């Protein structure tokens, strides 16, 4: 067993899980409170990356560009909610799926018109561009450690927001009983706009942190959206705690599985069979995990109270 590789892949799994959590936290709130299936959530992840790339170029600072990109993405999401999504709340889920799928196509063409078809890069400052020595001589990219730290901080702040504030009380109540908060005289449209904006900001944060380690390109949010939906189902729709735990589980299993499954299969089969089967099986691991968890807990690991 290569313990150095295992540690590196475990950290990579945590880093991937953190990005999944940021996407899943916003999307699970949107669906849990607004009962809206938003397939275009991955497009907000893409917009966050493009906003960060542009603002970093304009300001000459990645940190300043990232700070400005988060409220920009939140404002963008709130505008989208008010213009394009508000009429979908009374429609069935099939209509929501079709409409938000159309938004994916719209956002892709919108980005193509504004930024062109060629991908962008987000340059990192020198302090984040190197690696950090952890222990026993193991070095790990500094920016990936920053992603993990920022994700944990955001998870803690979300916990405080949801559990200790008036807005959080409304969010918890809305996730459990939307009719109740409406009967109490809460401005539902305003709450929905705030929740959607918060979800857009989280998606944008994930996008701007993913941008420096991959190409910022059209359609970059579509693949990760599918895994995000798996995270939400595993964790429990509407549950921030569930999204966090499930995201880390999925991130670790996906990353570590892809790295070590060929070697594990090689212990029982020939190298040719192991090399052929490992990619297919590794891509199935998170879906097998979802099936196993749903067989035991049909509402996910941590469903909201009253669900």
Residue ranges of predicted features:
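Transmembrane helix-bundle core of multi-pass membrane transporters
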Residues: 87-164, 191, 256-285, 299, ...
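Transmembrane alpha-helical segments in multi-pass inner-membrane proteins
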Residues: 60-62, 66-71, 193-203, 207-208, ...
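Membrane-embedded helix boundary and interhelical linker motif in transport proteins
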Residues: 11, 33-79, 83, 264-274
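Single transmembrane alpha-helix segments in multi-pass membrane proteins
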Residues: 5-55, 83-95, 179, 232-240
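Alpha-helical transmembrane segments within multi-pass membrane transporters and channels
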Residues: 60-104, 110, 245-250, 254, ...
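Helix-loop-helix "hairpin" substructures at the membrane interface of multi-pass membrane proteins
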Residues: 16-17, 137-221, 240-245
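Membrane-interfacial amphipathic/re-entrant helices at transmembrane-helix boundaries
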Residues: 1-22, 51, 59-65, 91-96, ...
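Hydrophobic core segments of alpha-helical transmembrane domains in multi-pass membrane transport
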Residues: 49-54, 70-76, 103-111, 150-159, ...
């Amino acid at each position: 067993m290569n313990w150095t590789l295992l540690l590196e892949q475990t950290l990579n799994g945590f880093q991937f899980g953190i990005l999944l959590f940021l996407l899943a936290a916003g999307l699970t709130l949107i669906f849990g409170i607004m009962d809206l299936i938003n397939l275009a959530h991955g497009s907000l992840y893409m917009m966050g990356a493009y906003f960060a790339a542009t603002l970093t170029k304009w300001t000459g600072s990645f940190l300043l560009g990232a700070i400005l990109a988060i409220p920009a993405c939140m404002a963008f999401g709130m505008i989208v909610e008010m213009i394009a999504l508000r009429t979908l709340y009374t429609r069935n889920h099939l209509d929501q799926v079709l409409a938000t799928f159309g938004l994916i196509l719209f956002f892709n063409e919108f980005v193509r018109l504004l930024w062109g078809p060629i991908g962008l890069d987000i340059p990192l400052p020198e302090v984040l561009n190197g690696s950090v020595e952890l222990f026993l001589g193991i070095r790990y990219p500094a920016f990936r450690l920053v992603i993990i730290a920022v994700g944990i901080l955001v998870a803690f702040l979300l916990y405080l927001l949801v559990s200790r504030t008036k807005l959080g009380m409304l969010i918890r109540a809305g996730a459990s009983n939307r009719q109740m908060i409406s009967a109490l005289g809460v401005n539902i449209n305003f709450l929905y706009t705030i929740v959607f904006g918060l979800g857009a900001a989280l998606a944008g944060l994930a996008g701007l942190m993913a941008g420096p380690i991959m190409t910022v390109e059209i359609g970059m949010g579509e693949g990760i959206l599918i895994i995000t939906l798996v995270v939400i189902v595993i964790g429990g729709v509407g549950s921030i705690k569930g999204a966090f735990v499930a995201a880390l589980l999925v991130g670790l299993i996906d990353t570590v599985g892809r790295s070590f499954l060929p070697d594990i299969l090689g212990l029982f089969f020939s190298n040719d069979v192991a090399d052929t089967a490992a990619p297919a099986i590794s891509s199935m691991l998170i879906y097998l995990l979802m099936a196993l968890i749903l067989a035991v807990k049909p509402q996910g690991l941590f469903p909201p109270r009253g669900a």
